[in-house]
Amino acid sequence: MTTKTTDETFTVDCPICKKAVIWSPQSPYRPFCSKRCQLIDLGEWAAEEKAIPCENADFAMDPENNEDWAKH
């Protein structure tokens, strides 16, 4: 959740632990609260626990069955 605080400063919830994070240069890991939460998130992406939804992702898995693969 994003909330507005004084002086045009925003607070967001850390995506991992849900702690409030002030959105400013003083929060170097934003939107995460810490390096630890940042690395947990990176690990989830690396382990393919997270992914961006895509309807046409299968072509990349088997280039031999996709004629367009050779053109790129």
UniProtKB/Swiss-Prot annotation:
Name of the protein in its database record: DNA gyrase inhibitor YacG
Organism lineage string: Bacteria, Pseudomonadati, Pseudomonadota, Gammaproteobacteria, Pasteurellales
Cofactor: how and how many bound: Binds 1 zinc ion.
Keyword Oxidoreductase: no
Family membership: Belongs to the DNA gyrase inhibitor YacG family.
UniProt entry tagged with the keyword Manganese: no
Subunit structure: Interacts with GyrB.
Keywords noted in UniProt: Metal-binding, Zinc
Main function: Inhibits all the catalytic activities of DNA gyrase by preventing its interaction with DNA. Acts by binding directly to the C-terminal domain of GyrB, which probably disrupts DNA binding by the gyrase.
GO biological process: regulation of DNA-templated transcription
Domain of life: Bacteria
Cofactor(s) required, per the database record: Zn(2+)
Binding site for Zn(2+): 14, 17, 33, 37
GO molecular-function term, one example from the UniProt record: zinc ion binding
Cited SUPFAM superfamilies: Glucocorticoid receptor-like (DNA-binding domain)
